């Protein structure tokens, strides 16, 4: 990966990444790796400590092969930690050379694919490298201030007649692109400033979806994330995994690793084709990029019923991205930070009528393509009752466990999902 940010030759004589956990655990970790047959890795790692870039990259490649030697759940934790170690060695060498882009790329791969042992070293190193990189470019403080750059989603015109015209055209467009019968059945109820007691009584316990409005205004993300200059400043050089293709059920679907700035550029210019959109989907971005994590707040609703947060994921993509009909095992709040989405929901008791896949890996996904229903193959699906809504910017949707849902972005969209369960639900799921 080519570094976007590099220090001049005279600026990096004293650049060093402190890695206290790696320093303390290195010998023990190498012994554990050797015990699993990783003798060649251990030899390369020793050379990497001395600054041998080829050896550091060779060790990283060896660990990468182990990560892809079988199903992810079967990979030994020691090899995940080995990959983190190698990424740190590669990053240290690039950082010492003032190659900040390459260093950040290596650290991000460690955060995305590595184990937990060296995670603090990875995070702390990202902060230090990012700080040095910002000295060479526009500062974060400037980008966080008075935003005047390009917006991801244009502001609505203030002229009343123009607003009506835009809304009328938007409604016609939406109806053309949405699945058959959209917005004709029961709409998901919207509640403004819903109390925790009301949420528990009326929606959580009965297991009923609800759209909650006026509960995200205090999030810094509500203003910051609509500005490309801010997103590029805090995360532009970071490496993220993206999906390319219509959706994960299609044969041509694939994954790529790109810098966040390249991903934003694809969204902004709509360079990906409608059949191959680029989507940053269900990625724990906020475990990786702390600055973006600081821009959001965990809704208090996620702690109702003695709940514990299970995962926190980002869903960033252009208009037209689709998550096909599926269900999840946990309570879910989907917070719409930028843009808008159409969401259709079916209750869990309609599982048989929605024809789930029999394969274990896809058993939570429906064979029914709502965008093109085959009535001959799936005769029960066409007439099923459902609930749906258009989730507007600044709104949150509560989706109960096991409720089937289909999601389509109507504009460029940045969303955050919060999954949570109580102890009893976690043990049974």
From Swiss-Prot:
Record's cofactor remark: Binds 1 Fe(2+) ion per subunit.
Stored Gene3D superfamilies: Cupin
Catalytic activity: N(6),N(6),N(6)-trimethyl-L-lysyl(36)-[histone H3] + 2 2-oxoglutarate + 2 O2 = N(6)-methyl-L-lysyl(36)-[histone H3] + 2 formaldehyde + 2 succinate + 2 CO2; N(6),N(6),N(6)-trimethyl-L-lysyl(27)-[histone H3] + 2 2-oxoglutarate + 2 O2 = N(6)-methyl-L-lysyl(27)-[histone H3] + 2 formaldehyde + 2 succinate + 2 CO2; N(6),N(6)-dimethyl-L-lysyl(36)-[histone H3] + 2 2-oxoglutarate + 2 O2 = L-lysyl(36)-[histone H3] + 2 formaldehyde + 2 succinate + 2 CO2
Subunit structure: Interacts with EFM. Binds to ATXR2, ARF7 and ARF19.
Limits of the JmjC domain: 272-429
Annotated knockout phenotype: Altered overall H3K36me3 modifications. No visible phenotype under normal growth conditions, but mutant plants have a short-period circadian phenotype. Defective temperature compensation leading to shorter circadian period at increasing temperatures with altered expression levels of clock genes at 27 degrees Celsius. Reduced callus formation from somatic cells associated with low Lateral organ Boundaries-Domain (LBD) transcript levels (e.g.
Gene Ontology MF terms in the entry: DNA-binding transcription factor activity; histone H3K27me2/H3K27me3 demethylase activity; histone H3K27me3 reader activity; histone H3K36 methyltransferase activity; histone H3K36me/H3K36me2 demethylase activity; histone H3K36me2/H3K36me3 demethylase activity; histone H3K9me2/H3K9me3 demethylase activity; metal ion binding
Cofactor(s) of this protein: Fe(2+)
EC number: 1.14.11.27, 1.14.11.68, 1.14.11.69
InterPro entries: ARM_KDM8_N, Cupin_8, JmjC_dom
Family: Belongs to the JARID1 histone demethylase family.
Induction comment from the UniProt entry of this chain: Circadian-regulation with a broad peak in the late day and early night. Stabilized at elevated temperatures (at protein level). Induced by abscisic acid (ABA) specifically during the post-germination stage in an ABI3-dependent manner. Repressed by brassinosteroids (BR) during the post-germination stage.
Protein's name according to its UniProt entry: Lysine-specific demethylase JMJ30
């Amino acid at each position: 990966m080519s570094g976007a940010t590099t220090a001049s030759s005279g600026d990096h004589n004293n650049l060093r990444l402190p890695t206290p956990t790696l320093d303390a655990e290195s010998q023990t970790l190498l012994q554990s790796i050797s015990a699993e047959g990783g003798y060649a890795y251990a030899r390369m790692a020793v050379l990497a400590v001395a600054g041998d870039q080829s050896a550091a990259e060779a060790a990283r490649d060896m660990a990468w092969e182990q990560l892809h030697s079988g199903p992810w759940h079967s990979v030994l934790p020691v090899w995940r930690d080995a990959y983190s170690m190698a990424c740190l060695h590669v990053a240290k060498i690039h950082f010492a050379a003032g190659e900040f882009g390459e260093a950040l790329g290596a650290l991000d791969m460690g955060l995305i694919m590595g184990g937990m042992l060296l995670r603090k070293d990875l995070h702390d190193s990202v902060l230090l490298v990012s700080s040095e990189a910002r000295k060479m470019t526009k500062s974060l403080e400037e980008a966080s201030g008075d935003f005047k750059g390009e917006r991801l989603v244009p502001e609505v015109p203030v002229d009343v007649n123009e607003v009506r015209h835009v809304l009328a055209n938007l409604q016609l467009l939406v109806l053309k692109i949405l699945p058959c019968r959209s917005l004709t059945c029961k709409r998901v109820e919207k509640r403004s400033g819903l109390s925790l007691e009301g949420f528990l009584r009326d929606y959580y316990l009965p297991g009923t979806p609800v759209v909650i409005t006026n509960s995200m205004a205090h999030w810094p993300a509500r203003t910051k994330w609509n500005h490309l200059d801010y997103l590029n400043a805090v995360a532009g050089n970071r490496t993220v995994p993206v999906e390319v293709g219509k959706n994960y059920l299609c044969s041509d679907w694939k994954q790529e690793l790109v810098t966040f700035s390249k991903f934003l550029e694809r969204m902004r210019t709509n360079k990906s084709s409608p059949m191959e959109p680029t989507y940053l989907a269900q990625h724990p971005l906020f475990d990786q990029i702390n600055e973006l994590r600081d821009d959001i707040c965990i809704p208090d609703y996620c702690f109702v019923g003695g709940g514990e947060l299970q995962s926190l994921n980002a869903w960033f993509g252009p208009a037209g991205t689709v998550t096909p009909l599926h269900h999840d095992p946990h309570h879910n709040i989907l917070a719409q930070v930028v843009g808008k989405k159409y969401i259709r929901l079916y209750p869990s008791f309609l599982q048989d009528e929605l024809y789930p896949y029999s394969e274990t890996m896809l058993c939570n996904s429906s064979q029914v393509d709502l965008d093109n229903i085959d009535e001959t193959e799936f005769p029960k699906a066409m007439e099923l009752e459902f609930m749906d809504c258009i989730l507007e910017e600044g709104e949150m949707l509560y989706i109960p466990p096991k409720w089937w849902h289909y999601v389509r972005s109507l504009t460029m969209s940045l969303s955050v999902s919060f999954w949570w369960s109580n102890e009893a639900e976690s043990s049974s799921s």
